[in-house]
Curated annotation (Swiss-Prot):
It comes from Escherichia coli (strain SMS-3-5 / SECEC). GO terms for molecular function: histidinol-phosphate transaminase activity; pyridoxal phosphate binding. It is an enzyme of class 2 (transferase). Homodimer. It holds the Pfam family Aminotran_1_2. Belongs to the class-II pyridoxal-phosphate-dependent aminotransferase family. Histidinol-phosphate aminotransferase subfamily. HAMAP family: HisC_aminotrans_2. Its cofactor is pyridoxal 5'-phosphate. One of its GO terms (biological process) is L-histidine biosynthetic process. Coiled coil: none annotated. Pathway: Amino-acid biosynthesis; L-histidine biosynthesis; L-histidine from 5-phospho-alpha-D-ribose 1-diphosphate: step 7/9. This is Histidinol-phosphate aminotransferase.
Length: 356
């Protein structure tokens, strides 16, 4: 008699799935964490809501209204979720039939688009970006048949550059009546002029992902947003969990999105941008650094001589970066989160000491 294991009972696509390798999963014993694009220091909050015996609102009113005001959209155009990662998954669950429809994304880019689709059993199609990391619009057009959701990260993680807005418009015209286009704006606070939030009225099939994990310094809160037209939001509400945000999370998120919270966020952004420019200038003078790419974000992508050896050397010194070697077109590249001046100096000194 054959013995069926628990793993045998699992769905085939789950058995074959490679989970997303988050910065925390990759681990390390560092004291300079520059691998997850987090804000380097903690922001203090006091809980104002102490009553936890009742279930929270599905979409907490204060959070939704504060975010809508901040983003310049209507409250009906906002959905809050457990990080933008949940938003990625909700869009696939709402719009893609497993075994029939596909998503499309353009590597090198964020890894959760493919993981979310593969978990659900939805086909993934890729159209690598051009050499300048802009969209290959002809390649996308050729692969659009059967695609229901297109993900475009701008500014792009891990490359750090903005997608050309005219290319976004062309993509939105190509997909009109065919697919949802998702602009992942996780890092938009570092270049707010580039947001597509003002385009929602023009493009009913546009959705925008946002997060409190980066500029708002709340990665541990797990709070993200989807901005879209009301018809899209209503569909997402059908597939979201009944209580996605706990009461303490909603409490802190509402405070972070208050007028004072927004002012504090913008001060953090200014500080990070100044530190980014300092670190970029220093990296360009270091012998083991071959190229430093422009960035509109809170991280820097650079190409190194002997990047694997450099990565391990810094790892052994407790400086944890993100290795991007396995991403298409990123051989020799490491991604460095912009941290404090002290952390920048640790990186600079360690790289200057490298003999490669």
């Amino acid at each position: 008699m054959s013995t069926v294991t628990i793993t045998d009972l699992a769905r085939e696509n789950v058995r074959n799935l490679t989970p997303y390798q988050s910065a925390r999963r990759l681990g390390g014993n560092g004291d300079v964490w520059l691998n997850a694009n987090e804000y380097p220091t903690a922001v203090e909050f006091q809980l104002t809501q102490q009553t936890l015996n009742r279930y929270p609102e599905c979409q907490p009113k204060a959070v939704i209204e504060n975010y809508a005001q901040y983003a310049g959209v209507k409250a009906e155009q906002v959905l809050v979720s457990r990080g933008a990662d949940e938003g990625i998954e909700l869009l696939i669950r709402a719009f893609c039939e497993p075994g029939k429809d596909a998503i499309l994304y353009c590597p090198p880019t964020y890894g959760m688009y493919s993981v979310s689709a593969e978990t659900i059993g939805v086909e993934c199609r890729t159209v690598p970006t051009l050499k300048n990391w802009q969209l290959d619009l002809q390649g996308i057009s050729d692969k659009l048949d059967g695609v229901k959701v297109v993900y475009v990260c701008s500014p792009n993680n891990p490359t750090g550059q903005l997608i050309n807005p005219q290319d976004f418009r062309t993509l939105l015209e190509l997909t009109r009546g065919k697919a949802i286009v998702v602009a992942d704006e996780a890092y938009i606070e570092f270049c707010p002029q580039a947001s597509l939030a003002g385009w929602l009225a023009e493009y009913p099939h546009l959705a925008i992902l946002r997060t409190l994990s980066k500029a708002f310094a709340l990665a541990g809160l797990r709070c993200g947003f989807t901005l879209a037209n009301e018809e899209v939001i209503n569909l997402l509400m059908k597939v979201i969990a009944p209580y996605p945000l706990s009461t303490p999370v909603a409490d802190i998120a509402a405070q972070a999105l208050s007028p004072q919270g927004i002012v504090a966020m913008r001060e953090r952004v200014a500080q990070i941008i100044a530190e980014r420019e300092y670190l970029m200038a220093a990296l360009k003078e270091i012998p083991c650094v071959e190229q430093v790419f422009d960035s509109e974000t809170n991280y820097i992508l650079a190409r190194f001589k002997a990047s694997s050896a450099v990565f391990k050397s810094l790892w052994d010194q407790g400086i944890i970066l993100r290795d991007q070697n396995k991403q298409p077109s990123l051989s020799g590249c490491l991604r460095i989160t912009v941290g404090t001046r002290e952390e920048s100096q640790r990186v600079i000194d360690a790289l200057r000491a490298e003999q490669v």
